[in-house]
Curated annotation (Swiss-Prot):
Residue span, Radical SAM core domain: 1-228
Protein species of origin: Helicobacter pylori (strain HPAG1)
Cofactor: how and how many bound: Binds 1 [4Fe-4S] cluster. The cluster is coordinated with 3 cysteines and an exchangeable S-adenosyl-L-methionine.
Gene Ontology MF annotations: 2 iron, 2 sulfur cluster binding; 4 iron, 4 sulfur cluster binding; biotin synthase activity; iron ion binding
Name used for this protein in its record: Biotin synthase
Cofactors, names only: [4Fe-4S] cluster; [2Fe-2S] cluster
Keywords: 2Fe-2S, 4Fe-4S, Biotin biosynthesis, Iron, Iron-sulfur, Metal-binding, S-adenosyl-L-methionine, Transferase
Length: 282
C-alpha cells in the first residue's frame, strides 16, 4: 500500500503584507476579507500542534506574512519551535517566513526548525506578471540559503495563474536544480479581491501538472496543497489518481486564509483510496 505524509499549517502571523503578490489575499494591496493579527499566542499554536499530531500530521509549518524575516520574527519562531519540541510530539517543524539570509536561517536551525519553505511560485519569466515588489531571484537565493544553512528545503509553486506550459516547465527545471526535499503543488482558485482573472484548472489539467512535476522531481516529496478541495471536488476517482501520478504528501486541514477539507473526513477519504498514513518522517 502506498504511504503518504500528512503536513499541517499554522498561520502564526496573518495579513497586512506590503508585497503585491497577485495570488495572495494577505497582501494589503488587495484588501481581502481575512483575519489579521500580528503574532498568534503560543498556547494556541501548541494546541494546534497537539491536535494535528493526534490526527496523524508529521509536518507542522509555522507561517508568517510579510516580505522577509526580521529579528522579531526570528525570535518568535525560535520560541515557538523550542516550545513545540519540548512537547516531544515527533513533529517535523517547518518555517515559512519569506526572504531570509544565511545567518537568520542558521539561527532558526539552532532553535529547532528542521526545514524552510520558500516557494518559487512560477517561472522566472512569468514572475514579474504576478509580483512587482520583489524578484524571483530573491526567492531563489533564499532557497539556496536554506540549503547552505543545513535545513531541509520545501519549495514549489502555483499552477493556474495564466502561465504557459513552458513557464511550468521552467519553474520545475529551476526547482530540480535546488533538489528540494518537498515540493508543494498548489492550484490557484479565483478570488474576486485578487487581480488574477484565471479559471480554475480542470482536474485533468491539474493531474497533467502533477505528472510533469514527477518527471522533473522524481525524488522529491510531492505535496498537494491549496486548491485540491476545489479542483477535485466530488471527483474521488480523479483525486485518487493524484497518488497514482506521484503525490505522496498532503496538507491536512486549513491553509493560510482559506478552508481546507475537514481533517477527519479527509483522512477517511484518503484511506478509502487504499493509502496508508506515514507514522514517521524518514
Amino acid at each position: 500500500m502506498q504511504e503518504i505524509f500528512l503536513c499541517s499549517i499554522s498561520n502564526v502571523r496573518s495579513g497586512d503584507c506590503k508585497e503585491d503578490c497577485a495570488y495572495c489575499t494577505q497582501s494589503s494591496h488587495h484588501q481581502g476579507a481575512i483575519k489579521r493579527y500580528k503574532f498568534k499566542d503560543e498556547k494556541v499554536v501548541l494546541q494546534e500542534a497537539r491536535a494535528l499530531r493526534e490526527l496523524g500530521a508529521l509536518g507542522f509549518c509555522l507561517v508568517t506574512s510579510g516580505r522577509e524575516l526580521d529579528d522579531e520574527k526570528c525570535e518568535y519562531i525560535a520560541k515557538l519551535a523550542k516550545a513545540i519540541n519540548q512537547e516531544e510530539l515527533g513533529l517535523h517543524l517547518i518555517a515559512c517566513c519569506g526572504r531570509a539570509d544565511l545567518e537568520q536561517l542558521e539561527f532558526l536551525r539552532d532553535a529547532g526548525i528542521h526545514s524552510y519553505n520558500h516557494n518559487l511560485e512560477t517561472s522566472q519569466n512569468f514572475f514579474p506578471k504576478i509580483c512587482s515588489t520583489h524578484t524571483w531571484e530573491e526567492r531563489f537565493i533564499t532557497c539556496e540559503n536554506a540549503l547552505r544553512a543545513g535545513l531541509g528545503l520545501c519549495s514549489g509553486g502555483i499552477f493556474g495563474l495564466n502561465e504557459s506550459w513552458e513557464d511550468r516547465i521552467e519553474m520545475l527545471r529551476a526547482l530540480a536544480s535546488l533538489s528540494p526535499h518537498t515540493t508543494p503543488i498548489n492550484f490557484f482558485i479565483k478570488n474576486p479581491v485578487l487581480p488574477i482573472d484565471a479559471e480554475t484548472l480542470s482536474a485533468d489539467e491539474a493531474l497533467e501538472c502533477v505528472l510533469l512535476a514527477k518527471e522533473f522531481l522524481p525524488n522529491a516529496r510531492l505535496m498537494v496543497a491549496g486548491g485540491r478541495e476545489v479542483v477535485f471536488k466530488d471527483n474521488d476517482k480523479k483525486e485518487a489518481k493524484l497518488f497514482e501520478y506521484g503525490i505522496n504528501a498532503v496538507v491536512l486541514g486549513d491553509y493560510l486564509t482559506t478552508k481546507g477539507k475537514a481533517p477527519k473526513k479527509d483522512i477517511e477519504k484518503l484511506l478509502s483510496y487504499g493509502l496508508t498514513m506515514a507514522t514517521s518522517c524518514h
